[in-house]
Amino acid sequence: MSTTTNIQLNNLTAISPIDGRYWGQVQVLSEYFSEYALIKYRVQVEIEYFIELSKLSELKPLNAVNKEDDHKKLRDIYLQFKESDAQKIKQIEKTTNHDIKAVEYFIKEKMHTELQYSEVVTEFIHFGLTSQDINNTAIPLSIVESVEKVLIPQLKQSILEPLRQFAQQWKSIPMLARTHGQPATPTTVGKELMVFIERLENQINHLEQSVPHTCKFGGATGNLNAHKVSYPAIDWVVFSEKFVKVLHPSLKRMRFTTQIEHYDNVASLLDAFKRINTILIDLCRDIWTYISMEYFNQKLVKGEVGSSTMPHKVNPIDFENAEGNMGVANALYEHLSAKLPISRLQRDLTDSTVLRSIGVPFSHSILSFKSIQRGLSKLVLNEANIAKDLDANWAVVSEAIQTILRREGFPKPYEALKELTRVSGSKKITESDIQTFIDSLSIPDDIKSELKLITPFNYIGIIPDF
């Protein structure tokens, strides 16, 4: 078997479709979840920690660098962080065989060469910390920023906004409902879309208001031992809790940890995105079914091909693509949320391994959001077919009739309607059948008139305002 060694990484050679075929649609997330992004976030945490240390009067060697100008120059190390800087850190790592130590050495070198800081000063980089103080702060920071800046805005823009527009546009259009795949009490097109809107909004509210973004910042085994022994007069717990808020107001430091964050809240966040995807899979399957029933038509896109052999095909590929990608995302969300909270004793390395894949399910989710958006943009409501289906299913008003008859004290109304409407084969209950049945009832004429006003088109119940 031949071995190819000269293949360069690009969109065609990438093993993952996220970095290959779909790169153009998901590259925005590389700012948060790529190797470059992780390194940059680590540098940011180290720098901001050093700046906060410099504000402590007890740390005499740092008093001289506690100036705004110094802080600006220090922040420029990560604010102006380039790919070449990340490459330099990776080069250092080849010697250290330790990614966080490589970040530490990179920053120290920058301080020496560009800021002319003494070695006494630079030794306060990574002071009292373990690697997981950096990772378990940098990664939650990348997650919260990606959720706030990309994932939730994309979900709202791609799906909630067009769904809400359609719901408003079609709020009064009656539609035959189907339970167990069979005709059921009518509803409206707009209300059925609002079901998904409400479900999604509930999950977004849960993400924004109820899922905390927690981090770990407490030294080798979570007790701030090195901090306490070196500067016992400082309240390091208060310092650490304030520090993580400097990075992002939503970050919250866990007080009781091992060497690593317990990830319970990361798991909660991943589970929330899994639920969002599950709701969207439900949406995709429903719209797919409505398209197959010709309740929706799809706008033709010039140049597109639906089948390599059947020229007539116009397939609901956007919803199918989204469903498939959300399945991949959910499998990864499930593994991450189940695995991350488990670590042997005070720490094993398994969390580090799987955390490197945390951007992958988010990428598949973003890809799905955009795919659904494309699919929604092609939808055209087929009102004629929807009306035709309603008119062919007059049996659905039997619920209304038997309920009014119950109100009037009519004997065995359910059984009477069941006898009329529960038919088999190709026989359909028509408007005429319903009218004839009503006329045969021994009830007052005004009740007969009330019953005759009920049709599959107006028997839609109470639709809340939206």
From Swiss-Prot:
Origin superkingdom: Eukaryota
Question: Pathway it belongs to?
Answer: Purine metabolism; AMP biosynthesis via de novo pathway; AMP from IMP: step 2/2; Purine metabolism; IMP biosynthesis via de novo pathway; 5-amino-1-(5-phospho-D-ribosyl)imidazole-4-carboxamide from 5-amino-1-(5-phospho-D-ribosyl)imidazole-4-carboxylate: step 2/2
Biological process terms in GO annotation: 'de novo' AMP biosynthetic process; 'de novo' IMP biosynthetic process; purine nucleotide biosynthetic process
Q: Supply the enzyme class, top level.
A: lyase
In the Enzyme Commission scheme, what number(s) does this protein have? 4.3.2.2
- Active site annotation, chain numbering: 180 (proton donor/acceptor), 307 (proton donor/acceptor)
Q: Which GO terms describe its molecular function?
A: (S)-2-(5-amino-1-(5-phospho-D-ribosyl)imidazole-4-carboxamido) succinate lyase (fumarate-forming) activity; N6-(1,2-dicarboxyethyl)AMP AMP-lyase (fumarate-forming) activity
Residues that, per the record, bind substrate: 21-22, 97-99, 130-131, 259, 347, 352, 356
Quaternary structure (record): Homotetramer. Residues from neighboring subunits contribute catalytic and substrate-binding residues to each active site.
Name the protein family: Belongs to the lyase 1 family. Adenylosuccinate lyase subfamily.
Name this protein carries in UniProt: Adenylosuccinate lyase
Question: What is the scientific name of the source organism?
Answer: Dictyostelium discoideum
